[in-house]
Amino acid sequence: MKKVRITAIRKACYPDLMEKYENPIQHACDVREGQVWIANGWAKPEGFCDSAWDSISAFVMTLAHGGGDFYDGWMKNPRSAMISCNDGFRPVSFYLEALEEDAQ
């Protein structure tokens, strides 16, 4: 099993949708563009958003176990994926890439 690098590539925010549909929340997303985590195999990295992990964990697990080439050639690098979290008000796009380093 391999480690997987998770990089926050882009963070969007839709204040018009938030104003129209969202109840005020105590803790908004604090992910920063360029932020990097290393998943040690299937384990969620410390400090990584639980909701975002729910969105990307299946892809991380597949990459960690040597899989890839999602959706028949979707990514230029077959050992990678671009996956967004499921927050419709402030989605974050994460670039996932399998590393050569073995998970511990």
Walk through the language-model features, giving the residues of each.
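Intrinsic-disorder/low-complexity, polar/charged segments enriched in Ser/Thr/Lys/Arg/Asp/Glu/Gln
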Residues: K3, V36-I38, P91-S93
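Short, Lys/Arg- and Gly-enriched loop/turn segments at beta-strand edges
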Residues: K44-S55
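A short, structured loop/turn motif at beta-sheet edges
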Residues: M1-K3, D30-E33, E101-A103
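Short, compact, well-ordered microdomains
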Residues: A58-Q104
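Short, surface-exposed beta-strand/loop "edge" segments at domain boundaries and coil↔beta transitions
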Residues: C13-L17, E46, D102-Q104
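Short, structured beta-strand/loop micro-motifs enriched in basic residues and often containing a Trp
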Residues: K2, A8-E22
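Short, flexible N-terminal segments of the mature chain
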Residues: K20-K44
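A structural detector for beta-sheet-dominated domains
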Residues: T7-I9, N40, E97-L99
